Curated annotation (Swiss-Prot):
Coiled coil: none annotated. Keywords: Activator, DNA-binding, Metal-binding, Nucleus, Repressor, Transcription, Transcription regulation, Zinc. Transcription factor that acts both as a transcription. Residues 1-27 are annotated as: Disordered. Testis-specific. Localizes to Sertoli cells. Belongs to the DMRT family. GO terms for cellular component: nucleus. One of its GO terms (molecular function) is DNA-binding transcription factor activity, RNA polymerase II-specific. In contrast to dmrt1y/dmy paralog, which plays a key role in male sex determination, its role is unclear. It comes from the Eukaryota. It holds the Pfam family Dmrt1. This is Doublesex- and mab-3-related transcription factor 1. Residues 27-74 bind DNA.
Length: 280
C-alpha cells in the first residue's frame, strides 16, 4: 500500500473549478441607463451616444483623458525608437555643474557618463561612500536625474533669457517721450522728442564766472534772416563804401588844418603822419 501511495501523483493545488469566460467590455453609457450591451461594434449604434446626463458627461471626460494618455504613450514610444529622448554625448570640453544640495561638491560630466568629484569634507565623503556601496544603482539613477535637470542647452538660455538692459533703456525712452516738445533751442525748429538729449554735467563747471547760465540766448528765424540780410555783400555795396569814407575823413582834416594856418595860429590838431613820426 505504501508503494502504491508513493507511485500516485499528488495534486499540487485544489481541483480547478468551472473556467470563466473572458470578460467582454460593455458599453458604459448603456450601463448607466440599465442596459447591458457588448462594446464591440456598438459605438456607432448606441442609443445614448449623444446623452448629456451627468453620468454620461463624466464618462465622456474620462474617455478624453484616456485617449490623451494613449497618444502620449505612443509619442514617447516613437521618440524612444527614433532615439530623440536619449541625450546625445557632447563632444566639447567638460561641463562643471554645481550640486544644489552641497555647495562645495562639484560634478564633472562628459556626455552621459560622469563621476562625482571627491568632496573636501571627510564626513560627506564617508556618507557618500556608504550610500553608493549600499545602493549603487539608485545613486546612479538619482545622479542621472540631477544631471539632466541641471544641464540645459545654451540655445535655451539664449532664447529665453531676458535682456539685462531692457528696463534701463525703456525708462530712458519713456523719459524722452515725456519731455515737452517746446524744449528745443530754436523756436522755429521743432526737434522730435526721442532725439532730444540732455547733458548729465552742469554747465557752470566749464563756463567763466561772469556768465550766469550755460544756455545761449534764444534766436528766432526772423532775427536770423535779418542778420543774414544785413551782412550780405549786396547790402554792403549799396550802403557803405570804404574808399568814400576814407576820402571824406581826410578832406575834413585837411580843411581844418588849412583854416588854422590861414588864421596865423599853430594847429591844435596834428595830422596823422606827423604824430606817427614823432612817436618813432
Amino acid at each position: 500500500m505504501s508503494k502504491e501511495k508513493q507511485g500516485r501523483p499528488v495534486p499540487e493545488g485544489p481541483a480547478p473549478g468551472p473556467q470563466r469566460s473572458p470578460r467582454m467590455p460593455k458599453c458604459s453609457r448603456c450601463r448607466n441607463h440599465g442596459f447591458v450591451s457588448p462594446l464591440k461594434g456598438h459605438k456607432r449604434f448606441c442609443r445614448w451616444k449623444d446623452c448629456r446626463c451627468a453620468k454620461c458627461k463624466l464618462i465622456a471626460e474620462r474617455q478624453r483623458v484616456m485617449a490623451a494618455q494613449v497618444a502620449l504613450r505612443r509619442q514617447q514610444a516613437q521618440e524612444e525608437e527614433l532615439g530623440i529622448c536619449s541625450p546625445e554625448a557632447s563632444s566639447g570640453p567638460e561641463v562643471m555643474v554645481k550640486n544644489e544640495a552641497g555647495a562645495d561638491c562639484l560634478f564633472s560630466m562628459e556626455g552621459r557618463s560622469g563621476t562625482p568629484a571627491v568632496p573636501p569634507n571627510p564626513l560627506s565623503a564617508a556618507g557618500s561612500c556608504s550610500a553608493s556601496s549600499s545602493s549603487p544603482s539608485a545613486a546612479a539613477r538619482v545622479y542621472g536625474e540631477e544631471a539632466s535637470d541641471l544641464l540645459l542647452e545654451t540655445s535655451y538660455y539664449n532664447f529665453y533669457q531676458p535682456s539685462r538692459y531692457s528696463s534701463y533703456y525703456g525708462n530712458l525712452y519713456q523719459q524722452y517721450q515725456q519731455m515737452p516738445p517746446s524744449d528745443g533751442r530754436l523756436s522755429g525748429h521743432s526737434m522730435p522728442s526721442q532725439y532730444r538729449m540732455h547733458s548729465f554735467y552742469p554747465g557752470t563747471a566749464y563756463l567763466p564766472q561772469g556768465l550766469g547760465s550755460p544756455v545761449p540766448p534764444y534766436f528766432s528765424l526772423e532775427d536770423n534772416d535779418g542778420a543774414a540780410a544785413s551782412f550780405s555783400p549786396s547790402s554792403l555795396t549799396s550802403t557803405h563804401d570804404s574808399t568814400l569814407t576814407c576820402r571824406s575823413i581826410s578832406s575834413l582834416v585837411n580843411v581844418g588844418v588849412k583854416a588854422e594856418f590861414e588864421s596865423g595860429g599853430q594847429p591844435s590838431v596834428f595830422p596823422a603822419d606827423s604824430m606817427s613820426s614823432e612817436t618813432k
